[in-house]
Amino acid sequence: MKKMFRRVLTLLLSVFVLFCALAAAACGPGEEDKEKPTPSEGKTVSRIAYTDAGKAYLEVDGNPFTYAGAQIRIDGFMDEEHQSIDEMERYFKLAADMNVTMVELPIQWKDIEPEKDQYDFRNVGKLLGFAQKYGLKVELLLFTVNVCGMSGVAPNYINQDAKTYPRYPSDLTDSTVAFYEQDNPNLLERESLAVEHLMSAVADWCEVAGENVVIAVQVHNEPDVFPLWRLQQYNVMTLDGSRRLTDMEAWEETLAALDTIGKVVKNSEYKVVTRVNTAIAWDAAWEAFVPDIYELEGIDIVGDDTYNETVSVNKEVMQNLSSGDLAGNLPHVAENRGSYGSSASLILAVFCMGGGYDIYDLITPKVFIEDWGWVDEGIIYSYDEDDPSTSMKDKPHTDLARRVLYGVKNAGYEMTLAPVGDIAGFNLKGNYPETSCEQTVDTSSVRITFSTREGALAFAIVRGGYLTLFSTHAAQFTLSNGTFSGAELGAYGTDGTFTASGSVAMSDGSVSLEGMQVCRIKIDSTDGSLTSTAVENIG
């Protein structure tokens, strides 16, 4: 009954907000105009699709998309370090050099609506231009009313009008930060308008650019932190101050807000996949709430900010996020610390488990570390204007992660569509690859024996009558349980076309790769089915 009541309430609230949104004023990118163009049916840029075997994947412009991203904290660089919008370009180049396919960009409400009904998307357009220049797609992170359980990024007119936009009494002493009543109709109306205008501006920009650069939207950021931690941490009270807000009350309004804003994106003229990142999906005490998010009409997929450096834990998260009540979800690591030395193994393991991976972050703003006491979480050394020798340099583990991402990117079409049991990862038993490793893994039809003396991480994918191989460093693959021919080197395009750039010798089913080579081999025949051991050889 409680869930049914919540759904009915959410539906009524969503209808009210959408009615208000359609009746309110709007403006275009970089303009201050209260005229709103008539809403159109728009277009669907991305969606969650499924293979015949039921594997979920992200489809962009009709093609499978490899979900490999890195977050760029443009808010930290611009707000706290006072870097210019033009200086943000260097971080996009770094992302492209890391071989990720997309970047996650925080979009703060106060930046796109500095004054009530006055919208400014010029910086958003600049950022999309940088992404397009370096061949990257973009996921927008909506930093609005719930950012890690609170908000300090709402426009001043929201923050200064507690009567119209109520916030809960608490022990917070910073007047610029608030615990808003997230499902308050007045607040949701304004937030919905801002998101609607944002998506309209994105649609206009992408139409002019001739490319759909934005492919997903994250609704809020770690919204579960509000009921999980903030209530007790800051003694958050009901609006009348008579008692503490319960975690269930907090959870219900969090769900309602997520659903409403997600629907705004999905009903916009530029329709993309919506997702939510949770802080605690793998925590047994709270995982029961994750399916509630997944069930929301406005949210397509749910990921977890694992912040864990072990392969086995990240593997388990992928399994939990794609089974039981979450069957059909696209499992993904929504954030994981880029500074982990095991990053390369973590990334490969997650992709072998059928998931996606977002690095948090590409490079950590200096002010976060020096002034705020944050850990350096970047996969690249933080920018240090005082010491050019350490300015945006690799960490010891960066190159191996870059190599893994190269393979994932250039074999992404096959990895995205292949069943998990037909993606064999090698040298992934531990958190770090062993320098010398020999390992045999069965897929559903091909047995592969892998060996390296150079600490290579590697994978093999069986799909559609072909076997795709990749290793970060020199390695040998010996194939059995069938006959094989035509070992070609090259890469897969976004439409699945394999473009050959050379060939490699194959003798008695054995192929030696130098490293950083994607190899496709024809499977002429197999000697019957095998029981896959791919999953058990991870972690």
Predicted regions: what they are:
Residues 85-162, 251-273:
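Aromatic-lined substrate-binding rim segments of carbohydrate-active enzymes
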